[in-house]
Design a protein with these regions (language model features):
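Short beta-strand segments
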Residues: 55-89, 105, 116-118
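Hydrophobic helical h-region of N-terminal Sec-dependent signal peptides
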Residues: 16-20
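Short, surface-exposed loop and linker segments with low hydrophobicity and enrichment for Pro/Ser/Thr
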Residues: 50-53, 75, 146-147
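Bacterial N-terminal signal peptides that target proteins for export
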Residues: 2-15
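Short, structured beta-strand-loop surface elements
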Residues: 38-40, 45-48, 66-69, 90-168
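Short, conserved active-site entrance elements at the starts or edges of catalytic domains
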Residues: 27-69
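C-terminal motif of bacterial Sec signal peptides marking the signal peptidase cleavage site
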Residues: 22-25
Length: 168
């Protein structure tokens, strides 16, 4: 093998390792999305999510149609021990579109990874209670000013809990 061929092979190898490093270590940062989430997988069921009340931001990883995970930073609140996440604005976010097709997701909360299912909150009264919690936790007027945008909320369920709720 010639010296120039060896150099090309080495360059390709280095580029491959750099690309793999970016893919494997690409977690979201603030408003910048990422791919796979890192952390310790939690396999025990969570029956009370109140520990999230002191957590300002969590990460969500969804599975879009194109096969690579999509992760982003989101806010959360707990209400009566249940966990809810939300999104605002005129257009649905990328993660919302993904869960509309596949409700399975993973949440990263303080370095722990929770496999979950995400379901839209349809009930108006519950949505209002969640919005009040969001206002308490995040002071929406301070964040958005007087024009607080419309919000959509989603309930976080663990796969085992979702399976138990199905009618027989």
């Amino acid at each position: 093998m010639s010296h120039s061929s060896q150099t090309r092979v080495q360059l390709r190898t280095v580029c491959l390792f750099i690309a793999l490093g970016l893919l494997v270590g690409c977690q979201p940062n603030d408003e910048d999305p990422g791919l796979w989430l890192k952390g310790t997988e939690v396999t025990r069921p969570v029956t009370d999510w109140t520990f999230t009340q002191s957590v300002d931001e969590i990460l969500i990883e969804t599975q879009p149609w194109y096969g690579l995970p999509h992760s982003t930073t989101i806010w959360c609140v707990q209400l009566d021990g249940a966990l809810y996440i939300g999104s605002y604005g005129n257009e649905r976010k990328h993660w919302e579109k993904s869960i509309a097709n596949d409700p399975r997701a993973r949440l990263s909360i303080q370095g722990d990874l929770y496999p979950v299912q995400i379901r839209p909150v349809i009930e108006g009264e519950l949505s209002q209670q969640i919005l009040e919690r969001y206002n308490q936790k995040y002071d929406m007027e301070e964040v958005f000013g007087k024009d607080v945008p419309e919000w959509w909320f989603y309930q976080v369920e663990q796969p085992e809990a979702s399976a138990k709720k199905k009618p027989s």
